[in-house]
Amino acid sequence: MHSNFFRLDQQVSIVTGASRGIGKAIALAHAQYGAHVVVSSRNLDACQKVVDEISSQGGRAAATEANISKKDSLESLIDFTLDRFGQIDHLVCNAASNPFYGPLSEIPDDAFEKILKNNILSNHWLASLSSRHISKSPSGSIVIVSSIAGLKGTPGLGAYAVSKAADMQLVRNLSIELGSQNIRVNGIAPGLIKTDFAKALWDNEEIRRHYENKTPLKRIGSPEDIAGISVFLASKASAYITGQTLIADGGITITG
């Protein structure tokens, strides 16, 4: 029994923003643990490369283009998954955007609206569109990738932080609403991870050294650090966990 705690065999996972970074690592990890994976992002060619990598390792996956800012595109993502694999067991809402760096008082309305739409509303849409299918799974789950930015005030990233705090509340509310359908809903709040999305932070030597010195584990994170948590939250090992956002930040939030 214990050897199967983390297996996802014959289950189907949708991962958004899966062409690179955390999303790619999550897609690869789900496939390595037996899931059939739908790899989605706006870049179909990049998604196909992830599918090819999964296939080369003996896994099964399919690529499709999806724009999280458009509800009809997400409807097509759900339809594609059902047409290709016939079921949905796990949804990982990883895709997000941050088009603005600076104080909230200076953010243009269109940039703020984009953040709210792509980081909050899209996750609501995906959960709503997929839940009636995930409810048919004996072990259905939804995971929303948030950020430790949603736990505290963050200079320069205020709008992004607001959206990520909202994602944590979305996790709590969805867990209550979907629990009776045997769907677990959880979040992951990464710290600084070495991805293109966060390159402006970790590629700055001064910022990176400050972060590493302040972090108990003395390093920034890797996409694989987050991928393992996503497998855990989809697997039997987390069967009694819902409504929680797991912090994966090397311990930096406990240092003040």
Give residue ranges: language-model regions.
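Active-site helix of classical SDR
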Residues: 127, 163, 171
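Alpha-helical segment proximal to the catalytic Tyr-Lys
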Residues: 132, 176-180, 239
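Conserved glycine-rich cofactor-binding loop
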Residues: 12, 19-21, 43
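Residue(s) in the substrate-gating loop at a strand-loop-helix junction
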Residues: 147
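Short C-terminal tail/terminal secondary-structure segment
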Residues: 2-5, 101, 152, 230-231, ...
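Substrate-binding pocket helix/loop in short-chain dehydrogenase/reductase
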Residues: 102-104, 108-116, 211
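Short, small/polar-rich loop/turn modules that mediate ligand/substrate recognition or access, typified
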Residues: 139, 179, 184, 241-243
